[in-house]
Amino acid sequence: MANPKIPQEFWSSYIVEKLRRTNPHIMLCFDESKYIKGGSVVYIPQAGTQPSVVKNRGFGAATAVQRGDTAVMYGLDVFTTDPTAITNAEANEISYEKTDSVLGDHTGTLAETIGDELTYSWVKGVKPAVGGGTTVEFLPSGRQIPTAGTATAVNAEDGQTGTRKAFTYKEVQLMQAKFNKDNVARDNRYAMVESYMYQQFIDSLSANQMAAFQATADLVNGVVGKFAGFTFLERSSVLALTTAGVFRLPGEALEATDNLASIFWQKDSVTKALGDTKLFQDMDNPLYYGDIHSGLVKMGGRCRRQDWKGVGLVVQAS
């Protein structure tokens, strides 16, 4: 029986707010939550070939063609926390409200994990395969820009060794040009930059560039500045790839030669869908002599375009 002090409505609003505050990028994408099919899948139609335009068409009927639309899809992942028991003795004897603390741990862990997974889902695509089933693909190398700064020692915290070329403002300008060339909408462009790559970017700016960048910061909403049309966010971990270009899973330990990456996107080019959010509570459990709590959130996402336009990476280069 659910604890009346913690109704499901409160949990749902609490976890959504925690997701928003911990992961600003969750709100900076297209929301397809209302299009979830069967509680776990979202299909995104992909328009077929555009019609040709003929100047001064000659006499006679034009040939009618049918546009062959396709679809891409993504499933919602189910994120759950390990159950936590609060014994009756703890509830009666400790000097702080442990239930609130435990729920804070659950929401914080869920938010951090989901934030990492959503970024990964934007570079991973699933689409229906001919004859049934699905195929999986990843952001192609043509949408990845290597860093081009001076050789800089990596940080040992991520498990890397050696040096990588530093991330500079010039790579951001190249990404801006790529988006412009692809006719990607010029508003609502964002960049999520790994912490050390962000520091390298800052170091590459001139005094005037730095002043302009800092003047556009909105730290309350997680924005550290704007440059070349991109609104910058900073995060301790974003993405990582092997030297062969294979994406590391979120939370996976890195090899010494792996490379970190920062992601760039336009808001309408990537998506998320939030499904069920539920707090499980087993009050006065006779086996644990107390209350047991755990949480569940269903969420998924991907790049909305099969051609991957509107998404790009800046990847460390040796």
Give a label for each model feature.
Residues 1-73, 309-310, 314-316:
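N-terminal "assembly arms/tails" that initiate or stabilize quaternary assembly
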Residues 44, 69-139, 180-195, 278-303:
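Long, contiguous amphipathic alpha-helices that act as assembly "spine/axial" helices in icosahedral shell
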Residues 52-55, 94, 200-203, 303-304:
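Short helix/loop capping segments that flank catalytic or ligand/cofactor-binding pockets
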Residues 131-220:
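Extended, solvent-exposed, turn-rich assembly/linker loops in the middle of proteins
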Residues 196-200, 238-241, 305:
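Short, catalytically relevant binding-site loops at active-site mouths
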Residues 213-227, 314-318:
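Short, cationic low-complexity segments
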Residues 221-283:
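Glycine/small-residue-rich hydrophobic helix-like segments
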Residues 260-318:
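C-terminal appended segment following the main domain
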